[in-house]
Amino acid sequence: MPSTRIQCALALLAVALSVCSVSGAPSDAKLRQFLQRSILAPSVKQELTRYTLAELLAELAEAENEVLDSDEVSRAAESEGARLEMERAAGPMLAPRERKAGCKNFFWKTFTSC
């Protein structure tokens, strides 16, 4: 019985310490400075909006550049695949298969000729 009380007390202590150490939002010195100024001057709210908008646009541009880089890689892979297909097509020309009379294949719910 005493060991379970000790375990519960330690678990409660761990939870309390983790709650105290975790902050709700990341701390940013510039953002905090803008917020302090906004209390004093209403024109700073516009600066805060510009700052957050500029930061958001910068993050979007960075993400877009990463996407474009991956598109270039996929395009290079596609062109490589197209080149391989052209090499295969340039190989010996095979005559089309001769169809036997009365031969039928079942394809997508219908019978087709061989």
Swiss-Prot record:
Keywords: Cleavage on pair of basic residues, Disulfide bond, Hormone, Secreted, Signal
Prodomain residues: 25-98
GO terms of molecular function: hormone activity
Compartments (UniProt record): Secreted
Disulfide bond among keywords: yes
InterPro entries attached to this UniProt entry: Somatostatin, Somatostatin/Cortistatin_C
Expression by tissue: Pancreas.
Disulfide bridge partners, by residue number: 103-114
Signal peptide range: 1-24
A GO CC term assigned to this protein in UniProt: extracellular space
GO biological process: regulation of cell migration
Pfam family, one: Somatostatin
Function field: Somatostatin inhibits the release of somatotropin.
PANTHER family: SOMATOSTATIN
Similarity section: Belongs to the somatostatin family.
Protein name per its UniProtKB record: Somatostatin-1
Gene: sst1
